[in-house]
Amino acid sequence: MCAPPMAIELPSPPKIGMVSLGCPKNLVDSERILTKLRSDGYGLSPDYAGADVVLVNTCGFLDSAKEESLEAIGEAIAENGRVIVTGCMGDEAEAIRARFPKVLAITGAHQYEEVVGAVHDAAPVPPSPYVDLVPEAGLKLTPRHYSYLKISEGCNHRCSFCIIPSIRGDLVSRRPDAILREAEKLVAAGTRELLVISQDTSAYGLDLRHKAFPLKGGGEVRAHMTDLARELGKLGAWVRLHYVYPYPHVDHVIPLMAEGLITPYLDIPFQHASPPVLKAMKRPANEAKVLERIAGWRAICPDIAIRSTFVVGFPGETEEDFQYLLDWLDEAQLDRVGAFRFEPVAGAAANDLPGAVPEEVKEERYARIMAKTAAISAAKLAAKVGRTLDVIIDAVDDEGGATGRSQADAPEIDGEVHLRDAGGLEPGAIVAVEIEDADEHDLFGVPVAAAS
């Protein structure tokens, strides 16, 4: 006679809560930390109440971002009480402890082993003979259909307004074969859009001397942005390049966009156009050459969307400098623009520059640049009315509507496409949409199947 099956009661694992702040690069770090903790046997909690420990992954790029991080730490302590701090503000442990003495541990940016060790110390996982049998599987904090793909860490540039190199160090590139393996797994799991990120995507592979690495299925790939983009484009997902520095070799990825191999989208933070301001920022200052290159890119790939960010009110920026920037934007006709008012950041060389711009002048210039770029955007989007565009669906509602993005729009930072008569669509679907209307930032349309 067979014995009845034995009931095995596994111990309940501790649960981890995560607050991830800042840029997509921080989000990828959070995913990596949680992936490791889950493979170690930890559970995840979507709220403070259910968490045994809360991780706060901080951002320290601007003083306003630091204040947001400190507020998040305070909220986590008030709501839960057991908090571990990691990320860019980890270098300011003394200041954090002075304000929040109850913090359990503080680790720095990309100190993955240290933060995982701190979690183990704070909330040990009960012994289980089954945990080691579970393979480590990637955990995502984004919707299933798009994923951020970090290809390197750190930066070799020393822009005067930036402290990222002091936090994250010089450029360290991942092996291209490892990046491609990760991308293949993401696509196999349902990712339809890969957003390539780093501190400086165009410098990828410089520290590896752009050498070639063997691929699992045969052949090889160089550690170089163009070669990596070409291989990623073969996976069948949209491939979107972010944080690109305007090196000459960026020209070589434009034909890949024209061929349809990667998404015709380029995120290049130009930061300014006035040569004196760019010089003070320690950025490239050949703005006329940049305009020539933009024209060349559009000649090769007419549908390319160019996104950029700019800083207004930088120390020493005169009204003449700012007007130069506005005139440059009129010529450049960029598709998507974000702007920031200059903020001093502790440790940044720009803090010591003369010619501080009054706050009221910063606000006035910020309003002017946003009005300028909104008008440019409105005209460019109006020209798309009547066209049919591929749109990736991000969300659907109960009334037959949906929201998605064209190839010209990255998630969260760019515009959206609002659809009517979109019943039956699901997030992640890529559909042809007839554009019916536009405003300053968004498009409005109907799926071609519904329009016919």
Curated annotation (Swiss-Prot):
GO terms for molecular function: 4 iron, 4 sulfur cluster binding; aspartic acid methylthiotransferase activity; metal ion binding; protein methylthiotransferase activity. Residues 141-379 form the Radical SAM core domain. [4Fe-4S] cluster 1 binds at C23, C59, C88. It is found in: Cytoplasm. Pfam families: Radical_SAM, TRAM_2, UPF0004. One of its GO terms (cellular component) is cytosol. The keyword Iron applies. Keywords: 4Fe-4S, Cytoplasm, Iron, Iron-sulfur, Metal-binding, S-adenosyl-L-methionine, Transferase. Residues 14-124 form the MTTase N-terminal domain. Its cofactor is [4Fe-4S] cluster. Its main location: cytoplasm. InterPro entries: Elp3/MiaA/NifB-like_rSAM (IPR006638), Methylthiotransferase (IPR005839), Methylthiotransferase_CS (IPR020612), Methylthiotransferase_N (IPR013848), Methylthiotransferase_N_sf (IPR038135), NA-bd_OB-fold (IPR012340), Ribosomal_uS12_MeSTrfase_RimO (IPR005840), rSAM (IPR007197). It catalyses: L-aspartate(89)-[ribosomal protein uS12]-hydrogen + (sulfur carrier)-SH + AH2 + 2 S-adenosyl-L-methionine = 3-methylsulfanyl-L-aspartate(89)-[ribosomal protein uS12]-hydrogen + (sulfur carrier)-H + 5'-deoxyadenosine + L-methionine + A + S-adenosyl-L-homocysteine + 2 H(+). Its EC number is 2.8.4.4. GO terms for biological process: tRNA modification. [4Fe-4S] cluster 2 binds at C155, C159, C162. Binds 2 [4Fe-4S] clusters. One cluster is coordinated with 3 cysteines and an exchangeable S-adenosyl-L-methionine. Residues 382-449 form the TRAM domain. Belongs to the methylthiotransferase family. RimO subfamily. HAMAP family: MTTase_RimO (MF_01865). Catalyzes the methylthiolation of an aspartic acid residue of ribosomal protein uS12. This is Ribosomal protein uS12 methylthiotransferase RimO. It comes from Rhizorhabdus wittichii (strain DSM 6014 / CCUG 31198 / JCM 15750 / NBRC 105917 / EY 4224 / RW1) (Sphingomonas wittichii).
